[in-house]
């Protein structure tokens, strides 16, 4: 028996890549090849050479003198595991076709593992504490013994039904650009843990490994690279379009989830399903996706639109071999992409030293990365990186772009349409004498989940869509609130209610107050010309909504002497969190006419993040001049009580804040004092 097996997801690449240099032979890599890379360099080179010859025949502008390297180039086979073709060879125990389940008991991982092989084969002992795994997956590790791959499964705290649903979904999805499912195994660990093993076809490598190959950056193969990138984009879009059309969200699209397959003298790119979900919009994975869309970052939700965000960033990494955004900074997308939106905020961020820091901008980031990316892709990337999910294109919309219409000149006609998904296979599994039947089914679904469609402010509404939330202390017997609409109870925050001063981080000063039977955490931004920017605003939203189980409310705007003050607050259990940001923007612009005072209900947060600061100031001035105080039932608001003192920066500050608690956490209060 030869070959190796891939369990559940692509084999993981080593943590560090060889160093890069610019020698006379062109930009390439030096150093030791990654030992555990599931990569066949000779097969890659064969595809490269064959594809390049086909490109040369069609691209007449390549000088004849530049084609001699084809005969002089000698491929070097990298050490490590070499796979040929796309076949999968594995233990007979796991050869389940077309779709069956096998219950097998395994030992705890900290002890020696005995893999019982079917049909009388001897037991192979693997010591997980000393033997080095040749590959590691999310739920399984693979060990090599006598040139044979053996699987050690990791117990999971999952129900049999969840395992069955995952395998059922994978088995019923079939497309030329999805990694093909070969079989599944459901197991029970001796201590009661549930595990699942999903067998899929094995390609040459994943995309992250592919772009680390010397061939990818060699100047000789520039024309192959240009064509391959275009085909990579089309193949992955085709796979995502099929998933989205059938109500499946990938959830963690990245380079490790794109598998490279050789097809004659060409490459085919297939999407590995990973931990896809059958829901239109689903709770985020237990581990954060590599490319987190804004709605995932701030609401913990994953939808099709998040897949398109991740697709654009993954393709950019394939083009440039580097990430577009810096990791670990949730405000990055807003600093870079904020100016791309309609009527973007034209205010300046202020650093710790008070110097203005302008938003970076999309084009500036491209220049900083020093990359020459195909202009055709940059246009699509910009569309997919819209901050608001409802503005991003779908995979189907991108596939009709002219960029992908000319691929047939080299690669032939497009892939045949996938077969129609049939009825669910009659499969069941019995665990502890309790039978479970999967009720999962592939179903068509709209292009966008209604919980994110046509929303001005996706953060507040997406969280609200998850479920109704009622702050418990508002409705507790003998508590602060009154269930009758319109009744509000005021809480005043002052120096007397201050319990502790937490400190200042990222220009946010944090204080904890105790008033009215509730703990109130107040975040304040203070500084010379503390103008709000999109990055500052969204950072406070991040602070206020760092956990999906917390309900965010964006509450109250009021006008001080020369400052406009924005508050962001959220409530969880018996704790009220509020954030204050100061704006020292004079109100000089006249407001447009047309507001009906009797029915006025203004979402200033939505106006601010979609129409810009100048337009928002017009609205605020109109509200102030008309003395309008529109507060629906259940409103939560913050207003300044004593905006009289001045701080050392010369701007107005407030010694006390009044918090008005009402009945509806999602309703805004607008008006003036």
UniProtKB/Swiss-Prot annotation:
InterPro entries xref list: Kinase-like_dom_sf, Plant_MAPKKK, Prot_kinase_dom
GO molecular function: ATP binding; protein serine kinase activity; protein serine/threonine kinase activity
Pfam families tied to this protein: Pkinase (PF00069)
Transmembrane segments: none
Residues at the catalytic site: 252
Reactions catalysed, as given in the entry: L-seryl-[protein] + ATP = O-phospho-L-seryl-[protein] + ADP + H(+); L-threonyl-[protein] + ATP = O-phospho-L-threonyl-[protein] + ADP + H(+)
This protein's record includes keyword Coiled coil: no
Keyword presence, ATP-binding: yes
Record GO biological process: signal transduction
Source taxon at top rank: Viruses
Family to which the UniProt record says this protein belongs: Belongs to the protein kinase superfamily. Ser/Thr protein kinase family.
PANTHER family: CCR4-NOT TRANSCRIPTIONAL COMPLEX SUBUNIT CAF120-RELATED, MITOGEN-ACTIVATED PROTEIN KINASE KINASE KINASE 19
Protein name: Protein kinase ORF74
Gene: ORF74
């Amino acid at each position: 028996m030869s070959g190796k097996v891939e369990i559940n997801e692509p084999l993981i690449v080593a943590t560090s890549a060889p160093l890069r240099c610019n020698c006379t032979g062109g930009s390439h890599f030096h150093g030791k090849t990654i030992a555990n890379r599931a990569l066949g360099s000779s097969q890659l080179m064969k595809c490269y050479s064959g594809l390049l010859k086909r490109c040369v025949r069609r691209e007449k502008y390549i000088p004849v003198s530049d084609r001699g390297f084809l005969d002089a180039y000698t491929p070097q086979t990298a050490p490590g595991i070499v796979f040929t073709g796309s076949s999968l060879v594995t233990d007979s125990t796991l050869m389940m076709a077309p779709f069956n389940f096998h219950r097998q008991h395994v030992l705890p991982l900290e002890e020696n593992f005995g893999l019982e092989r079917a049909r009388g084969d001897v037991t192979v002992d693997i010591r997980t504490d000393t033997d080095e795994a040749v590959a590691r997956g999310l739920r399984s590790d693979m060990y090599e013994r006598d040139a044979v791959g053996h699987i050690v499964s990791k117990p999971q705290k999952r129900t049999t039904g969840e395992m069955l649903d995952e395998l059922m979904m994978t088995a019923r999805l079939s497309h030329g650009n999805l990694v093909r499912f070969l079989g599944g195994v459901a197991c029970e660990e001796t201590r009661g843990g549930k595990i699942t093993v999903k067998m899929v076809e094995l390609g040459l490598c994943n995309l992250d490994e592919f772009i680390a190959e010397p061939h990818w950056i060699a100047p000789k193969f520039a024309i192959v690279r240009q064509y391959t990138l275009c085909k990579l984009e089309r193949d992955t879009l085709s796979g995502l379009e099929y998933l989205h059309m059938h109500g499946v969200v990938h959830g963690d699209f990245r380079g490790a989830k794109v598998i490279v397959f050789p097809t004659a003298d060409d490459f085919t790119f297939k999407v590995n399903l990973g931990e896809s979900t059958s829901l239109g919009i689903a709770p985020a994975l237990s581990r954060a996706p590599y490319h987190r869309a804004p709605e995932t970052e701030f609401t913990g939700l994953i939808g099709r639109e998040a897949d398109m965000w991740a697709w654009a960033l993954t393709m950019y990494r394939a083009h440039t071999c580097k990430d577009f955004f810096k990791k670990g900074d949730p405000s990055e997308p807003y600093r870079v992409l904020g100016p791309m939106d309609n009527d973007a905020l034209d205010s300046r961020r202020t650093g710790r030293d008070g110097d203005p820091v302008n938003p970076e901008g999309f084009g500036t980031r491209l220049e900083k990365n020093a990359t020459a990316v195909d202009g055709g892709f940059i246009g699509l990337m910009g569309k997919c990186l819209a901050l608001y999910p409802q503005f991003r294109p779908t995979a189907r919309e991108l596939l009709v772009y002219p960029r992908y219409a000319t691929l047939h000149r080299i690669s032939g006609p497009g892939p045949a349409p996938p077969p129609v998904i049939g009825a669910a296979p009659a499969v069941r599994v019995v665990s502890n004498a309790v039978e479970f039947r999967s009720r999962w089914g592939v179903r068509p679904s709209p292009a966008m989940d209604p919980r994110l469609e046509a929303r001005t402010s996706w953060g507040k509404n997406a969280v609200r869509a998850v479920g109704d939330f009622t702050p418990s202390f508002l409705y507790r017997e003998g508590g602060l609130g009154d269930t009758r609409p319109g009744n509000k109870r005021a809480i005043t925050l002052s120096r007397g209610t201050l319990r502790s001063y937490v400190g200042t981080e990222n220009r946010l000063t944090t204080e904890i107050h105790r008033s009215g039977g509730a703990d109130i955490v107040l975040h304040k931004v203070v500084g010379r010309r503390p103008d709000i920017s999109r990055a500052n605003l969204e950072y406070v939203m991040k602070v206020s909504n760092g956990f999906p189980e917390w309900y965010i409310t964006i509450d109250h705007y009021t006008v001080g002497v020369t400052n406009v003050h924005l508050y962001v607050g959220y409530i969880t259990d018996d704790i009220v969190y509020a954030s204050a940001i100061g704006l020292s923007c004079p109100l000089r612009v006249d407001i447009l006419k047309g507001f009906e005072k009797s029915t006025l209900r203004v979402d200033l947060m939505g106006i601010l993040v979609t129409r810009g600061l100048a337009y928002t100031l017009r609205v605020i001035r109109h509200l102030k001049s008309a003395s309008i105080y529109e507060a629906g039932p259940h409103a939560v608001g913050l207003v300044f009580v004593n905006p009289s003192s001045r701080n050392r920066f010369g701007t107005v500050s407030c010694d006390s804040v009044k918090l008005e608690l009402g009945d509806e956490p999602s309703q805004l209060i607008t008006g003036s004092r």
